[in-house]
């Protein structure tokens, strides 16, 4: 399990860097470039979806060439380029280009990193392993957000955004240095010379494919987190306090990720996933109708609980029910399907907000989450597989 901690530390430093700037993006777009919620949603949707198309191919290359560490390193290295692109951006189009670069890196690194976590886990403890990784990942996010908050809070105005973009390069570099500690499991290259990866996907258990469709359905209502930040600002929080709320969310998810992973090892992944979808529905209904600041803080805490229940547990579930020789491909396929859904999700959310007001995208997301929970529950009753068949 030691390798899991090293992989987690790579994500820890990378997320300090990323989350120093991520919650600032919607605020920066609105304040500096006059972007509307619809435009912000479109930018986030394009960035997430275009990059996510790479995830399944990245997973396929991981399975074929067994060069997980090299592929993951190249993805994390893209984070440095992203920060430089933010510094140089002179319009909302420049921010869009930077976000696409960032998400391309995530698309490249996600599948090989998750395979390394899965392979490094103690038998029977995949949930715990992914929980440890997610906990370190979210801890880095929380620290990055806190650093951004402190710089903005104690700054004198003017150039704090640019200052944060520059400082974020430091932890991005540290994440790359941590790769020297990771030991990759040596495997023989799998010879799949001319066979398209989707041909293997066709042979998978139909219930596994149905689960991926459930994830797609859920994601259509799970728009970018920037809408949570914009919603918090709409009820009266200033920019620095909005960032602090995002810190609370990440800190909560970090603290609860390992207990959630351990819980899934004991009671099963599917039960926790259904419960997570239900928590999400409660949170989104809350974001739709709550106007009191104190209750908004509670919602960010509950959103952290949802993330802890879903993120690591879902990856552990996919890695366990996928055939061993297609583990990277399936993790990548899942990420791609989710990413493709993010473009319409964020675009729909932006349009709903603009046309019908702030509550509309959250009601839409909550309803789709309830539907996804129902479908997943019915799949469980039908015997959704717990382990893979090769």
Report the location of each language-model feature:
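Glycine-rich segments within core transmembrane alpha-helices of 12-TM secondary carriers
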Residues: 131-148, 335-345
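Helix-to-loop junctions at the C-terminal end of transmembrane segments
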Residues: 54-66, 152, 256-268, 353
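Helix-loop boundary and gating motifs at the non-cytosolic
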Residues: 1-51, 207-245
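Structural signature of the two symmetry-related core transmembrane helices
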Residues: 70-84, 169, 271-286, 366
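Transmembrane alpha-helix termini and helix-breaking/packing motifs in multi-pass membrane transporters
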Residues: 27-32, 143-160, 344-360
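Cytoplasmic helix-loop-helix junction between adjacent transmembrane helices
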Residues: 98-139, 317
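C-terminal membrane-cytosol helix-exit motif in multi-pass small-molecule transporters
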Residues: 169-189, 372-380
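Juxtamembrane intracellular "pre-TM" segments in multi-pass secondary transporters
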Residues: 1, 184-214
């Amino acid at each position: 399990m030691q390798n899991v901690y090293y992989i987690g530390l790579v994500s820890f430093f990378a997320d300090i860097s990323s989350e120093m700037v991520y919650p600032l993006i919607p605020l920066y777009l609105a304040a500096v470039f006059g972007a509307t919620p619809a435009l912000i949603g479109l930018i986030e949707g394009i960035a997430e979806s275009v990059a996510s198309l790479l995830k399944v191919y990245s997973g396929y290359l991981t399975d074929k060439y067994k060069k997980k560490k090299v592929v993951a390193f190249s993805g994390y290295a893209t984070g440095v380029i992203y920060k430089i692109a933010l510094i140089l951006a002179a319009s909302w189009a420049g921010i869009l280009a930077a976000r696409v670069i960032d998400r391309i890196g995530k698309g490249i690194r996600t599948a090989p990193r998750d395979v390394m976590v899965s392979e490094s886990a103690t038998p029977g403890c995949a949930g715990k392993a992914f929980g440890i990784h997610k906990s370190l990942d979210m801890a880095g996010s929380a620290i990055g957000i806190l650093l951004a908050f402190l710089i903005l809070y104690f700054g004198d105005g003017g150039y704090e955004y640019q200052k944060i973009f520059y400082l974020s390069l430091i932890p991005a570099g540290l994440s790359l240095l941590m790769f020297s500690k990771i030991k990759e499991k040596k495997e023989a290259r799998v010879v799949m010379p001319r066979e398209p990866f989707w041909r293997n996907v066709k042979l998978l258990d139909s219930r596994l494919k149905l689960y991926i469709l459930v994830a797609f359905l859920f994601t259509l209502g799970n728009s970018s987190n920037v809408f949570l930040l914009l919603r918090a600002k709409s009820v009266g929080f200033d920019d620095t306090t909005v960032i602090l709320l995002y810190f609370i969310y990440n800190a909560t998810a970090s603290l609860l990720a390992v207990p959630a992973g351990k819980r899934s090892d004991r009671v099963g992944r599917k039960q926790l996933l259904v419960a997570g979808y239900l928590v999400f529905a409660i949170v989104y209904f809350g974001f739709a109708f709550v106007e009191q600041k104190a209750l908004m803080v509670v919602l960010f805490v509950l959103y952290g609980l949802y993330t802890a229940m879903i993120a690591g547990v879902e990856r552990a579930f996919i890695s366990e029910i996928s055939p061993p020789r297609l583990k990277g491909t399936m993790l990548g396929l899942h990420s791609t399907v989710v990413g493709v859904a993010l473009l319409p999700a964020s675009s729909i959310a932006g349009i709903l907000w603009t046309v019908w007001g702030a509550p509309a995208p959250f009601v839409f997301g909550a309803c789709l989450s309830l539907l996804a929970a129902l479908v997943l529950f019915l799949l469980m009753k039908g015997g959704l597989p717990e382990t893979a068949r090769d």
